[in-house]
Amino acid sequence: MLFRSQQSTSAILPIDEAEPDYLLKIILIGDSGVGKTNLLSQFISHQFSDDTKTTIGVEFATKSLNINGKMVKAQIWDTAGQERYRSITSAYYKGANGAMILYDITSSISFNSVSKWLQELRESTDPNIAIMLVGNKNDQEELRSVKLEEGKNLAEGNRLMFLETSAKEAKNVEEAFHELINSIVECYTKNGITGKEIKRNNIQGTAVKKEEKSCC
């Protein structure tokens, strides 16, 4: 289930009976129509809709995962891609532990916008935030306008993780989220960053400082 919010205030989520080791904030960004809502819906509830409405403001959902023996609750924010909602959505970048930047492989315009989204993300969050570039809708191969190699090269040039997905066919959806979340947990575990540190920084709207504890 997705919960809609058009306000720029922090949302308080219900806590599961078992307190997670890590409560992570993940944001999905990219142009309108690239499939962010369906990607999230497929990951959370294994559902896809051809009639998904354009996201207004911000929606979020949560999912609990076991990552290498760690209980992780991922709080995933689906942001609007339209310019008129930018002031609302950018407010939710603060305190993010990871991000996915989506483009549509059938739309070179959405691919060309990736650099803009990446710049905005890095200006609003910790510059070392874990980021995955996702080329969505690769079930529409006959309409492809962005080559696989173009996505790979852009990701490599900006030190991003990369996968192509199909929210419609559930291809690489689980893999994309798990790879991103796993990379965050591995980084925090390696550097001794605790769930309490992350929770405190998320409440304050800041990322865990990585000058001393860098994942790069």
What are these regions (language model features)?
Residues L40-S41:
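Post-Walker A alpha-helix
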Residues A96-S115, T125-N128, N138-S145, A170:
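Conserved Switch II/interswitch segment of TRAFAC-class P-loop GTPases
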Residues Q75-W77, Y103, W117:
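WD40-repeat beta-propellers
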Residues S45-M71:
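Switch I (effector-binding) loop of TRAFAC-class P-loop GTPase G-domains
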Residues V72-Y85:
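Switch II (G3) loop of P-loop NTPases
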Residues M1-G33, T37, I67-M71, P127-C216:
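Conserved P-loop small GTPase signature centered on TRAFAC-class small GTPases
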